[in-house]
């Protein structure tokens, strides 16, 4: 508990130093950017007129839809690749092939084939989340200590039991790392997708603000994305601690 409180205190101190440095740089004219006070005032304005809330819900809906779908498919596919050599040989080359293609490069194709509604945005987020999570899950399965598997077999455990009692628990830390990486990819992708084709969302708001050189609004969207992403990542970290209590931690 003391270590956790110390960590929280250091987190808050780090944020305070960062905001203080931002304020000093803008107040002294060292950089031509809006200061924290300007950004806060614009955030209040956008909150009161409902724009910020609407943009948050629009982006969150897209991120969660694509992210959940991507992770839900990535985990079983990753286990399949790691557990069965035939499945690995069939699927792994395609996964690596599509990993080399940035999801952002797929956006124009997705718009042409899926239209200009929510489908192309959710699809590219799904793709980014899937590719991040499937590799981590696959790596988790093949990284399981063979001694544990052999010991279970010596004790008479069947493949199904070994998979459920050995492979899955040992792979959970890898899976959660992949999920966290996938979350970051989802946020990066949704912003890019909204910059290209959207009528709402934090990325769309930044694109509109850029046309009028409205830097405070751009900063509001950037800070909001950072806060939302940080909060969601902390939730995943809490899930990680709960699901991997058996694991030694530094």
Curated annotation (Swiss-Prot):
Transmembrane regions listed in the UniProt entry: 12-32, 63-83, 94-114, 122-142, 172-192, 211-231
Species this protein is from: Brucella abortus (strain 2308)
Location in or out of the cell: Cell inner membrane
Annotated family: Belongs to the binding-protein-dependent transport system permease family.
UniProt protein name: Probable ABC transporter permease protein BAB2_1148
GO cellular component: plasma membrane
UniProt entry tagged with the keyword Cell inner membrane: yes
Membrane topology classification: Multi-pass membrane protein
Stored CDD domains: TM_PBP2
Keywords associated with the record: Cell inner membrane, Cell membrane, Membrane, Transmembrane, Transmembrane helix, Transport
Subunit structure: The complex is composed of two ATP-binding proteins (BAB2_1147), two transmembrane proteins (BAB2_1148) and a solute-binding protein (BAB2_1146).
InterPro entries: MetI-like, MetI-like_sf
Domain ABC transmembrane type-1 residue range list: 56-236
Domain of life of the organism encoding this protein: Bacteria
Pfam families, per database record: BPD_transp_1
Lineage: Bacteria, Pseudomonadati, Pseudomonadota, Alphaproteobacteria, Hyphomicrobiales
GO biological process terms, semicolon-separated: transmembrane transport
Function per UniProt: Probably part of an ABC transporter complex. Probably responsible for the translocation of the substrate across the membrane.
